[in-house]
């Protein structure tokens, strides 16, 4: 909208230079002021929009912190780029989505309304290949045991 505002004063200057067209200038002035008033409304709404943006500001849940912690446990001297971190975050989201979907299907097949650790475990065995599934199941079992004991 700023480029339009710059164009309008440029149009007014030639009209001001011609004294013969003062009446037409006076007639055009209110017409030009009305769009300006219209422009002020979106600016005010924009200011209100900023408040709404502040209110709508939600924290985006990512696994970046946890990926970094695991990386430092495995390789303390190695870093990770932000692009690689984004890829890892997308990868984890994708795997969790697949596990949730498979768990949901298993619960529906067995006509059960809840997804239990058993459905999750079976979904892990179905989604992840071979040795990776075995390690995931053992780590998951260990985590559930630790959670229930504390």
Swiss-Prot record:
Keywords: Acetylation, Chromosome, DNA-binding, Isopeptide bond, Methylation, Nucleosome core, Nucleus, Ubl conjugation. It comes from the Eukaryota. Transmembrane segments: none annotated. This is Histone H2B.6. The modification N,N-dimethylalanine is found at residue 2. Residues 1-35 have a biased composition (Basic and acidic residues). GO terms for molecular function: DNA binding; protein heterodimerization activity; structural constituent of chromatin. It holds the Pfam family Histone. The nucleosome is a histone octamer containing two molecules each of H2A, H2B, H3 and H4 assembled in one H3-H4 heterotetramer and two H2A-H2B heterodimers. The octamer wraps approximately 147 bp of DNA. The keyword Transport does not apply. Residues 1-58 are annotated as: Disordered. PANTHER family: HISTONE H2B. SMART domains: H2B (SM00427). The modification N6,N6-dimethyllysine is found at residue 13. The modification N,N,N-trimethylalanine is found at residue 2. Belongs to the histone H2B family. Signal peptide: none annotated. There is a cross-link at residue 146 (Glycyl lysine isopeptide (Lys-Gly) (interchain with G-Cter in ubiquitin)). The modification N6-acetyllysine is found at residues 7, 12, 28, 33, 39-40. The modification N-methylalanine is found at residue 2. GO terms for cellular component: chloroplast stroma; chloroplast thylakoid; cytosol; nucleolus; nucleosome.
């Amino acid at each position: 909208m700023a480029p339009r505002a710059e164009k309008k004063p440029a149009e007014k200057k030639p009209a001001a230079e011609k004294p013969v067209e003062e009446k037409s200038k006076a007639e055009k002035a209110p017409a030009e002021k009305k769009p300006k008033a219209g422009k002020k409304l979106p600016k005010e709404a924009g200011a209100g929009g900023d408040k709404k943006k502040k209110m709508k500001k939600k924290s985006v849940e990512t696994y970046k912190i946890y990926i970094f912690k695991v990386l430092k446990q495995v390789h303390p001297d190695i870093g990770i780029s932000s692009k690689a971190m984004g890829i890892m975050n997308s990868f984890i989201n994708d795997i969790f989505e697949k596990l949730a979907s498979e768990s949901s299907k298993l619960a529906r097949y067995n006509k059960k309304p809840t997804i239990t650790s058993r459905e999750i475990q079976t979904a892990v065995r179905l989604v992840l290949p071979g040795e990776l599934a075995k390690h995931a199941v053992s780590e998951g079992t260990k985590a559930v045991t630790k959670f229930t004991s504390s």
